[in-house]
């Protein structure tokens, strides 16, 4: 049959085939009924309130001490567990705690007897360490380990600790008064010194402040110069950058315009090509057809005109021949007339010349006075003497006509007056 236990207890199996007994702390074990026996022992931690009443210390002063200890049976160490089983197997936790408490109290009393009240009161850590050390070495033989020990309380019935406190309090108060007086004295000295140091520090501080102000103003002036220089450089750089940016923008704009212009040119070229094709489809081909038609019409008209011209030329030729025949007949008649005039001239000579001159004289007079007939307006300017108005014009015309014989004589060499006064001669 299997038996189990928790980590806070141990099982001890003894009997048939179990020599020495088997000890299991926190686990399971197989037990043969009737021929084997199983017992349990607690491994719980036990809290002990260790009181030592009216124990005389090294100087014979009785005091009472209370300590708190934590102890337990050690289950991890087989030897300590075996010792605990030999001593406490079958006992309850209360019985085990009582045994451990009696042991600890004895060791606590022993340590108190070897120490003074002042040592126990002032150095509790030392007292606790000594009790823990002595009790642990004794309880380990029982299989019990001391987990911790602390001194909880110290008191006495003789007011020793209170008197010790009074003396200490009086000493402390005395030291406090002395310290207070010395402190006041030192405080006055320190106050005066502090005032002196304060004034000196104030002067030094003002000097340092003046130096700092001077250094600040110098550094600030240098900083302002540097800042203004950097700001001017930054402004100039900004303006340069703005100018460069504007230039780049302008270049980009020009490039865009060039591209747009190129695109427009390409579009225009495409439009021109399209219009040329459209023109060729709408105008050129019909024009070529019209031209061919006109050429054909012109050729037909040309042939017609040639035929008309040939007919007119034939008509003109025949008319010319007729006119030539008429002119020839007229010329023959005029020649006969001229021959007769020549015969008459030969017969009458000067009389014939005079007759010819007189016959042509009106024509000559007409040609001489021709410019006057084309004048639309005549303006007469008088010098204040002589005739005026139409009489003046008539006189001028008569004067021109009176000079006609002279003109004829200069042109022909024949004097009308001489011919007129000579007697007519015949051949």
Swiss-Prot record:
> Molecular function terms in GO for this entry?
protease binding
Keyword vocabulary terms for this entry: Cell membrane, Endosome, Membrane, Phosphoprotein
Q: Which residues carry this modification: Phosphoserine?
A: 19, 163, 385
The record's subcellular locations are:
Cell membrane; Endosome; Membrane, Caveola; Melanosome
> Which Pfam families does the UniProt entry name for this protein?
Band_7, Flot
Q: Which GO terms describe its cellular component?
A: adherens junction; apical part of cell; basolateral plasma membrane; cell-cell contact zone; centriolar satellite; COP9 signalosome; cortical actin cytoskeleton; cytoplasmic vesicle
Membrane topology category: Peripheral membrane protein
Which residues are connected by disulfide bridges in this protein? none
**Gene Ontology BP, a term:** positive regulation of interferon-beta production
- Known function: May act as a scaffolding protein within caveolar membranes, functionally participating in formation of caveolae or caveolae-like vesicles.
| Subunit annotation | Heterooligomeric complex of flotillin-1 and flotillin-2 and caveolin-1 and caveolin-2. Interacts with ECPAS.
Record-stated family:
Belongs to the band 7/mec-2 family. Flotillin subfamily.
Protein name, UniProt field:
Flotillin-1
Q: Which source organism?
A: Sus scrofa (Pig)
């Amino acid at each position: 049959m299997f038996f189990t236990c928790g980590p806070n207890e141990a099982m001890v199996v003894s009997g048939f085939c179990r020599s020495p007994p088997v000890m299991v702390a926190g686990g399971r074990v197989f037990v043969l009924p009737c021929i084997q026996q199983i017992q349990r022992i607690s491994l719980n931690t036990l809290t002990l309130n260790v009181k030592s009443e009216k124990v005389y210390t090294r100087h014979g002063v009785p005091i009472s001490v209370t300590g708190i200890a934590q102890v337990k049976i050690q289950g991890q160490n087989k030897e300590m567990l075996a010792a605990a089983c030999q001593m406490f197997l079958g006992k309850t936790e209360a019985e085990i705690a009582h045994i451990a408490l009696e042991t600890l109290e004895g060791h606590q009393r022993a340590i108190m007897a070897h120490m003074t009240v002042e040592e126990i009161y002032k150095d509790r850590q030392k007292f606790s360490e000594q009790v823990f050390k002595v009790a642990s070495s004794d309880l380990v033989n029982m299989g019990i380990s001391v987990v911790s020990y602390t001194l909880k309380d110290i008191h006495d019935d003789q007011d020793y600790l209170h008197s010790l406190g009074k003396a200490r309090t009086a000493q402390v108060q005395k030291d406090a008064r002395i310290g207070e007086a010395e402190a006041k004295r030192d405080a006055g000295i320190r106050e005066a010194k502090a005032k002196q140091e304060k004034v000196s520090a104030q002067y030094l501080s003002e000097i340092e402040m003046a130096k700092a102000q001077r250094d600040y103003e110098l550094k600030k002036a240098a900083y302002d110069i540097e800042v203004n220089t950097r700001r001017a450089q930054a402004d100039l750089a900004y303006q340069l950058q703005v100018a460069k940016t504007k230039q780049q923008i302008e270049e980009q704009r020009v490039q865009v315009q060039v591209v747009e212009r190129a695109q427009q040119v390409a579009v225009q070229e495409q439009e021109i090509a399209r219009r040329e094709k459209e023109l060729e489809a709408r105008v050129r081909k019909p024009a070529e057809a019209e031209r061919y038609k006109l050429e054909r019409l012109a050729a037909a008209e040309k042939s017609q005109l040639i035929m008309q011209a040939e007919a007119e030329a034939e008509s003109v030729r025949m008319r010319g021949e007729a006119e030539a025949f008429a002119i020839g007949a007229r010329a023959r008649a005029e020649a006969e007339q001229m021959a007769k005039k020549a015969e008459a001239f030969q017969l009458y000579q000067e009389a014939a010349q005079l007759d010819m001159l007189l016959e042509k004289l009106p024509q000559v007079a007409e040609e001489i006075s021709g410019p006057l007939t084309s004048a639309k307006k005549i303006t007469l300017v008088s010098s204040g003497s002589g005739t005026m108005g139409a009489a003046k014009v008539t006189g001028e015309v008569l004067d021109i006509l009176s000079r006609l014989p002279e003109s004829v004589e200069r042109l022909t060499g024949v004097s009308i007056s001489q011919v007129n006064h000579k007697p007519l001669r015949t051949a």
